[in-house]
Amino acid sequence: MSSPFTEEQIKRYSRHIVLPEVGGKGQLKLLKAKVFLVGAGGLGSPAAFYLAAAGVGRIGIADSDIVDHSNLQRQILHSTKDIGRSKAISAKETLEALNPDIEVVPYTERLTSENILDIIKDYDVILDGADNFPTRYLVNDACVFLKKPLSHGSIFRFEGQVTTIVPFEGPCYRCLYESPPPPGLVPSCQEAGVLGVLPGVVGSIQATEVVKLILGKGEILKGKLLIYDSLNMDFKKVEIHKNPNCPVCSDKATIKELIDYEEFCHAHVGS
């Protein structure tokens, strides 16, 4: 009986194949999987690296930004030669150089209510590494509507958070944060800073969650928020619950279609 793997693949993925929890069947699942990453920045960089190395067959990666000097302290997909170039294109080149066995699809356009459903509909799992609230709510709502599992991660200064959202099986992002903070209340990484190695830890945890979702193995962070304090080297898990009045995923949902998320986040000034 012929092997489903090429000789090169057997060599490349041998450390996976010998794991009973992965094996040949699991590696085939990874090779057939399609994962979409929102952002090729701090969180998207380590997540994309490890998903590509693991052999995820198709990786879509969306980022409308260009590489800046200040990104290089933490966004390891990019190097000095990429300054001024599209992050999505830079990511594609880096990942395909790491693993020519996979396909990387770059999306240089900004994700909006008009295009996101069509873009992510054919992907199996979504990984959110966005650095702004409008995109986080947009991605959450789109994943709920399409019933796509979602790994959400965020970083701020020395702290990171990760949760895994499986629509209608556990809480969504809106169950955790029903409304965004007023604009300006939470400073950006540009304003507050971020420890360069922090997204490496958080993004790698997100990639681990995605691999477990694909394999159907282990316990995922569904209904749990993992909080990492890098300054004090402390991990803690907090239980989170479905909001019975969630406007998107509850029986009383009032949001039935994607909205203007910039306006939604701006509208909560002073609320």
Model-based region annotation:
Residues 1-271:
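Adenine nucleotide-associated cytosolic modules
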